[in-house]
Amino acid sequence: MPLPRYKQINTDVTPYYHCISRCVRQSYLCCRDARTGINYEHRRKWIQDRLHKLSQAFAIDLCAYAVMHNHIHVVLHIAKGRAEGWTMDEVLLRWRMFYKCPPVVQRYLENFDSVTLDELAELKSLSVIYRERLQSISWFMRMLNEYIARRANKEDECKGYFWERRFKSQAILDEKALASVMAYVDLNPIRAKIATTLGNSHHTSIQYRLNAKRSNKTPKFLMPFSDSHYKSTVPLPFAFSDYLQLITDTLNAERNNDTCITPKLPNRLLSKLGMTKENWQLVTSNFETLFTGPVGCPEMMENFARCCQRACRPNVANAQRYLS
């Protein structure tokens, strides 16, 4: 039986989560249909655009994403403190980007002085609900999946499920796990042979970051790295230059069929993480196989299980072997 979401997500322990949504029956609903010949590749752009829009409205940052032909990967960061700093008006305006609000909210947003004291109390009550939702991964994924499903069904002139009923989520508990899952996501299209380089890996965060880098711009919709010039938000705990070198070395090693990466120069990120080249290669190639639940060092996994009241501690042996 699937675990309830409160046993999978706990922002008091970690703000980072890896989420996966798969198309029903693992059908390829975002590429060329082999039976009809119809190309649905444009749906990947729908998903990417929706992710960007959601990241603008939610107190949730996009660390990494990859839109595949029959599933999506996203690595998310919950910026809980950011949501708490929004005014009531900001919360209502952000929620209205996606849903039609009650008449009292619509009237208030059209004329901020046209409400009674009772209506103002109702607005404050609604803003509390909306604020909580705007920092919820469940609502983030719901607004992503529901929108894409409706649009795809309209295009196909049919009804029914587009996605599997529940998305999978993994708590990412430390820097080793975070760097590993981001690399796993960014390299996924190349390993699936739907791209050949990081630059032509379409509808991925790494391509978006590289395009921004070439234009000397900051990726607008993504969580910045620590070496970014954009300092208005909490950055990822490592530099993009080090991360890019590491995943490039990883990719080159795989192409040469090496058992571990052999960079020309020592990689600062790998040294900072304290991981061996062999363990890095293994974890970033088999992340979902090695870890089916929360990911991190054994101590962090034990703490997460205790805080979330989970009796089972899956994959502790793998964490001990590869991430300790």
PLM ranges: what are they?
Residues 1-324:
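Short catalytic/metal-binding and nucleic-acid-binding patches
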